[in-house]
């Protein structure tokens, strides 16, 4: 708390900034962990597998071919689609259990569905899902 021009105000920015700064300082490691969680969820037949299967069923063949262009065609289409998932956005929600929300996409112009990974403020994975 701080008295400012006759008003008492609460200052939370420093704590939120410190939390944010700590998270950002370890962003590369968090990204590695998030992407490992995506791979693990896929291999376990979880939501990421559903995301991949859904798009292979719903997208037309020419779109799939365009999305998979440049990937290793000796691998199954599922693996290739998984390999083109790219980080699109990280949303930060100070004070929330899901402090950072990582959005991955095969291309926003192709599909509005996202693979979403939620982490706490320490970068620990809370859960992996897919949503629009």
Predicted feature locations:
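Acidic, proline/glycine-rich low-complexity IDRs
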Residues: 79-132
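N-terminal domain-onset segments
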Residues: 1-98
């Amino acid at each position: 708390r701080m008295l400012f021009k006759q008003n008492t105000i609460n200052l939370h920015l420093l704590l939120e900034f410190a939390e944010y700064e700590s998270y950002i300082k370890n962003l590369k490691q968090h990204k590695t962990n998030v992407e490992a969680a995506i791979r693990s969820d896929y291999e376990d037949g979880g939501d990421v597998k559903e995301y991949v299967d859904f798009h292979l069923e719903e997208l037309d063949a020419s779109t799939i071919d365009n999305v998979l262009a440049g990937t290793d065609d000796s691998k199954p289409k599922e693996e290739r689609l998984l390999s083109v998932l790219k980080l699109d956005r990280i949303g930060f929600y100070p004070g929330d259990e899901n402090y950072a929300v990582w959005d991955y996409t095969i291309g926003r112009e192709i599909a509005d569905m996202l693979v979403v990974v939620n982490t706490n403020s320490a970068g620990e994975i809370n859960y992996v899902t897919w949503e629009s």
